[in-house]
Amino acid sequence: RQAFNRVCTELFAAPERMGVAALMMMDLDNLKHINDTYGHDWGDQYIRRTGQCLRDNTPAGTVCARLSGDEFLVLFHGYRSRDAVREKIDCLTNAMQQSVALLPSGNALHISLSGGIAWYPDDGQDWETLKKYADFAMYQVKHADKGRVEEFDIGVYNREAYAERTRREFRQLLSNAQVFYCFQPIFSARSGRVVAYEALMRSDLPTLRSPATIMKLAREQGALYEIERITFTKALETFDSLCRAGS
């Protein structure tokens, strides 16, 4: 892993050597099942078979490494176009799908990988950014339909990042009761007098300016009771303080 990082850092420092490049991060789909069912020796054999397939089906100069237990990284570099890289990636993934590892039962298990691809220089021009984006693309595959390789999509990334920030700020809102209340007077049509007030919940957290967003997250996360509790206590406290101030 350290050697892979060192080589990639050196390559990224020399754009003329990188050309059009793709960083592909891959995760073995069945490793945990093999380890749990047959033992780690057979899981190690599955890993070795994957490594052999990478070595035998990538062009000379391609940088390959095992990142962790079930994750592999491949850097295709020095190409003139994305299509040229895609041809090499297709050859590799097809070879992977045809490769098998023998199990103690005598059955042959096809290697299954989920992968994500980030492009240099379009998606990022440094090693850490490409690795982050390739990792994101890979986990999009793993959480949807395993056994595929997908390219990074900045639009999906931005939507997911915003959604995660919204969830994080909602947790912050619940923990700190980070809302305030405005009061809308309700008038009697007959007398024209104020007969009640409607408490309107607001938040100054950037992604939670809309009460509709807060309520949607509360329903999704089973936190409606918490919102009701916060509203009951804070709305009454705010109303009382406004009355005392003569508002």
Regions of interest found by a model, annotated:
Residues 20, 128, 147, 195-198, ...:
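Short beta-strand edge/capping elements of PAS-family sensory modules
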Residues 1-22, 29-59, 65-69, 73-74, ...:
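Conserved long alpha-helical elements within nucleotide-processing catalytic cores of c-di-GMP signaling
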Residues 230-247:
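Helix C-cap/alpha-to-beta connector motif
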Residues 65-67, 96-113, 142, 243-247:
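Catalytic core regions of nucleotide second-messenger enzymes
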Residues 40, 86, 90, 105, ...:
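Catalytic-core segments of nucleotide cyclases and related cyclic-nucleotide turnover enzymes
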Residues 6, 114-116, 139, 182, ...:
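PAS-family sensory domains
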Residues 75-85, 103-108, 113-130, 155-157, ...:
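Catalytic strand-loop-helix junctions within cyclic-nucleotide turnover domains
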Residues 2, 121, 136, 140-182, ...:
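C-di-GMP signaling machinery
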